[in-house]
Each structure stands twice: as structure tokens, then as C-alpha cells.
């Protein structure tokens, strides 16, 4: 398969991966709910995404770099929102 075809598949996967976090971002920032969100799980996912980002940089994959950078930003926003909500409620 041509290089552009492989990168296109990566971009499509990246877009779907980004969109997948939308419902939780909405739950936290629009609905103001944090139930069911595990911060330790988000921390592990963030570490995995950073490693994928580094890998993408090393293999020069635009799709991996873009998708993981945007996803890390979205997850950071979710984590910040959850921490703010929990502090406002006085829960750990």
C-alpha cells in the first residue's frame, strides 16, 4: 500500500480516537458530572498516549503525532474538570 494510504488510515483512526473522548469531555464540562471517571485510569492512558506520541515522532508519522497530541489535550481538560468538580464537592 502506498505511504499516503497508510497515513490516511492512521488519520482516520486518530480522528475516531479523538471523537471517542467527546462524551466524557461533555459529561465533565457541560453537564458538570464526574461520576464513573477514574483518575488513575486516565493517568495510565495519558502515559500510554505520551509514549505513542514519542513513537510517532520517532517514525515521523504525522497521523500519530496529531492524534496523540490532540487526545492528550482533551484528556488533560477532562482531568482538570474532574479535579475541579471534586474539589468543589469536597471529595478526594
Go through each PLM region and give its residues.
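Alpha-helical membrane-protein topology signature
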Residues: 1-92
Amino acid at each position: 500500500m502506498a505511504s499516503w494510504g497508510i497515513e490516511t488510515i492512521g488519520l482516520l483512526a486518530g480522528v475516531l480516537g479523538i471523537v471517542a473522548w467527546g462524551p466524557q469531555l461533555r459529561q465533565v464540562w457541560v453537564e458538570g458530572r464526574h461520576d464513573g471517571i477514574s483518575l488513575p485510569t486516565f493517568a495510565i492512558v495519558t502515559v500510554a498516549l505520551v509514549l505513542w506520541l514519542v513513537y510517532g515522532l520517532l517514525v515521523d508519522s504525522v497521523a500519530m503525532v496529531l492524534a496523540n497530541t490532540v487526545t492528550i489535550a482533551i484528556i488533560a481538560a477532562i482531568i482538570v474538570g474532574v479535579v475541579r468538580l471534586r474539589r468543589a464537592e469536597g471529595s478526594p
